[in-house]
Structures are given as structure tokens and as C-alpha cells.
Amino acid sequence: MMARRDPTSWAKRLVRAQTLQKQRRAPVGPRAPPPDEEDPRLKCKNCGAFGHTARSTRCPMKCWKAALVPATLGKKEGKENLKPWKPRVEANPGPLNKDKGEKEERPRQQDPQRKALLHMFSGKPPEKPLPNGKGSTEPSDYLRVASGPMPVHTTSKRPRVDPVLADGSATEMSDRGSVLASLSPLRKASLSSSSSLGPKERQTGAAADMPQPAVRHQGREPLLVVKPTHSRPEGGCREVPQAASKTHGLLQAARPQAQDKRPAVTSQPCPPAATHSLGLGSNLSFGPGAKRPAQAPIQACLNFPKKPRLGPFQIPESAIQGGELGAPENLQPPPAATELGPSTSPQMGRRTPAQVPSVDRQPPHSRPCLPTAQACTMSHHPAASHDGAQPLRVLFRRLENGRWSSSLLAAPSFHSPEKPGAFLAQSPHVSEKSEAPCVRVPPSVLYEDLQVSSSSEDSDSDLE
């Protein structure tokens, strides 16, 4: 009996049973909401609203009767944005009202400043406020005042200058500026230092004897023109002030009124021996190979280019213009090696610009022919042999090229004369033009020449 059953009928029965089970289980599951109810999880694709789908009858795109019409807000009379909002109460002003109040206060604060400026430039008296407290200042008032040409009165604001000092100070500053323009940096420094010091503190004896107008009106002329006994060579020169004693003696005759304005400042009177020998017979001049001394006072000439340096103790071509002859000389060592006592002259004890002899760039026209080397013996300087130190013996030779060479020789020590008057009797004056084979030259002249050459080398080494 079991074999006779049809398999197809068996399959149909299973399908029917499964469908019946599904129908029975359906009420147990979640029910779909009716089409009229809103579901926030749904979104319409047509109108973009939530709660219904595109097929729902609630969509306004399908049912135009239920669509909302935009309501009009009403029209205002007049133009739009004429009064966009009502002003708030002043008791509680907003941020916009605060900004307006600050803008109104700023021009009120600037009004006194404008009045002060107008009074300063126009010179008109300030306006008095009205008794009711309301000022008559309008924006048009400022425009009226500024539009026309305003007179500027600067006489009241300009600092008053003493009429006595007005002429001299202006001329002095202009002339001094023109003099400074033609000087080298080293000379400008010396000029500024000497001008800053008072008349009693200046240590340049040569510049102290000159009156103040000499700096103003000489221009490119030499600051100190000292006339020796014979004729002075003409042409452009580079002058350096000589010793204080010589300048003082010559300037008294040339410029008697200079002493009233500016007296000479010297620590001690110069010894009569050096004064006599330097003031009457000597006219020292350096040749083209000479060096400019490091401690030179005010100079108002042009700065010439440097020449090649010579030996440490070498004297230039025209070291002794009066004698023109070489002479071994007994000299005292430099002041650093000896003690400086009361008997030492200021030229030996103090290295001031007054120790430097004058410099002449132009050699004399007529000069006798000299042998290669000549020598003579000279007595020792009384002021230099203060402590009895061993003196130096220097031999000066005249070279073929017109220059001088020096060499140190050992010399026995001897006692110098006690009085300066004895030195005057032993050392005659230097003649103008030498004709004898040997001429005695005062030792102070050669000592100053050596000191100038050594100081110039020290200054060049410091600059390099």
C-alpha cells in the first residue's frame, strides 16, 4: 500500500502546510502602519518632507488641495529700510548706541586741540565761549580758516640769540667748519681736543699765543708763520709750531695784541741757552723724506701723501738749514730713561707739540756742495745732563742722494757746565750759510730732530 502513493501529491501537501503556517504567524509580527498615519522614519522623495512616502496621499505634490499657501506679511507705506528698527531706550543703550556716543565724544575732545593749533599758526586770540555755554564752532569755520593763506609768525617761537654773540659765533662756526674740511682725521681730532679745552688748560704753547681770529680768516695759509732772521722760502708748506719760547719771542714783536686776548700757557720758562740758539740762528726744515710728527697741534694746510720711511735716527735732507753739515753730537738718552727734575726744561720733560720744529717742504735754492761725511765735537747740553747719565754720541753723514744717515758712537762721559751762560759762550750761533768745514750745532736742535723721527715711527706703527 505504501508503494502505491504518488510523490507529487506528497509535495503539494507540504507547500499547503507551509503557507498555512505563514498565514497564522503573520498577526504575531509587526503590523505595517496604515497609509493615513505619519511615520517619522519615512521621507518623501517628491517634496522632501518626513512622515510619508511619495505614494502617500498626504504628499502635497499629489494632493494640491492640502498644500500650504505662503501668507503675506503686509506692506508698509513709504520706502523700505527707512526705519528698519525702533531706537531703544537710552537707559539701556545697545552696542550700536555706545559706538555712536564714542564717535560724538571724539570730535568734542579734538576741538580744543584744533583751536590751539589754529591759534599757534594764525596768531589770533582764542574765541571766548558764549555765556549760554554753546560754542559757535561749526565744521565750515575750520574750512574757511584753512582755505586761505595763513600767515606764519615764527618770531615769537624762534630762540633769541645775543646780538653780541650772533656775529662772532656764526662766523666762527662757518670758518671753523671750512678749516676742518681740509684737515686729515688726526688733525681734526687734535683740533677738536684743543678747541674743547679752556684757554688756561691748553698745553700747546704755539697755539696759545695766537689770537682767535687766526683760526677764522687764514683758510689754507699756515696757522703759525714764524719769520726767521733770513728770508723764508716761498711756496706751499706744511708748518708745524716751533718751541714755545721761540714762538713767544717772535710773536710779541709781530702781534703785540695777541697777549691781551689769549696769554701763552707754559709751565716753566725755557732756558736761555736753547732760546737764544733757536731764536736767532736756526731754521730747521725737513726734506721730502720727513715724517709728520704724531703730536702736532692745529694745522690748516693740505695733507700731503706719505713718503718712504728712513732710519730710526735718520735726519732728512735739510735738517740743519743754517749749517748743512753732519756733526757727531753728545746727546742725552730719551726722557723715559732719565729722571725729570726741576732743572729739566719743559722741552725735555714734557712731550708737547711745542717741541716740534718747523717743517719746510721746499728746499733752499742755493746750497753749497758738501763732502760725504764730516764731523765736529760739541759740548753737552746743560739741561739734558741732569743726573749724570752716560751721553750718546751720534754721527750724521750726508748721503749721495741728498739725505742724512745717523749712527751711534760710544763717547766718554764728562761733566757739563753748571750755568747755562757758559753754554752760550762755548756754542756760537748757527750761521746763515755755512762756508767753514765744520759748524757747531746746538744739541737741543738735534735732540728734537731725533725725537720727531722716533715719535713719527711710533705713531705709524700704532696706526698699522
Swiss-Prot record:
This is Protein FAM90A5. It comes from Homo sapiens. Residues 74-89, 97-114 have a biased composition (Basic and acidic residues). Residues 180-197 have a biased composition (Low complexity). Belongs to the FAM90 family. Primate-specific FAM90A gene family, thought to have arisen during multiple duplication and rearrangement events. It comes from the Eukaryota. Residues 16-42, 70-389, 415-437 are annotated as: Disordered.
